[in-house]
Amino acid sequence: MLKPLGDRVILEAKDEEEQTVGGIVLASNAKEKSQTGKIIAVGNGTVLDNGQTVPMNVKVGDTVVYDKYAGTEVSYEDKKYLVVHEKDLVAVVE
């Protein structure tokens, strides 16, 4: 299992949209990169200069929206994940 460090989270990104709301099927090069994902692992939080740790605002299982160009894609056990800093998370989907 992957364990993120510091203020990072590991996301299982939602698949790219294959068709538009109107039902038009998109070519593979026209698909938009999804900006939502499900958190599967959370780091311990940000460590301040005085040694205190600020806990994360999100938890495992949350579905979140993240910045379009945020994160680093990693592969682990034949699956792709996204490692993102908490500051690059925009919202939690409720």
From Swiss-Prot:
The UniProt record lists the keyword Transport: no
GO cellular component: cytoplasm
InterPro entries, sorted: Chaperonin_GroES, Chaperonin_GroES_sf, Chaprnonin_Cpn10_CS, GroES-like_sf
Superkingdom as given in the UniProt entry: Bacteria
Cell location: Cytoplasm
Cysteine pairings via disulfide bonds: none
GO biological processes: chaperone cofactor-dependent protein refolding
SUPFAM superfamilies, per the entry: GroES-like
Keywords, sorted A to Z: Chaperone, Cytoplasm
Single GO MF annotation: protein folding chaperone
Pfam families noted in UniProt: Cpn10
Stated family: Belongs to the GroES chaperonin family.
Subunit structure: Heptamer of 7 subunits arranged in a ring. Interacts with the chaperonin GroEL.
Known function: Together with the chaperonin GroEL, plays an essential role in assisting protein folding. The GroEL-GroES system forms a nano-cage that allows encapsulation of the non-native substrate proteins and provides a physical environment optimized to promote and accelerate protein folding. GroES binds to the apical surface of the GroEL ring, thereby capping the opening of the GroEL channel.
NCBIfam families associated with the record: PRK00364.2-2, PRK00364.2-4, PRK00364.2-5
Protein name, as recorded: Co-chaperonin GroES
Organism the protein comes from: Pediococcus pentosaceus (strain ATCC 25745 / CCUG 21536 / LMG 10740 / 183-1w)
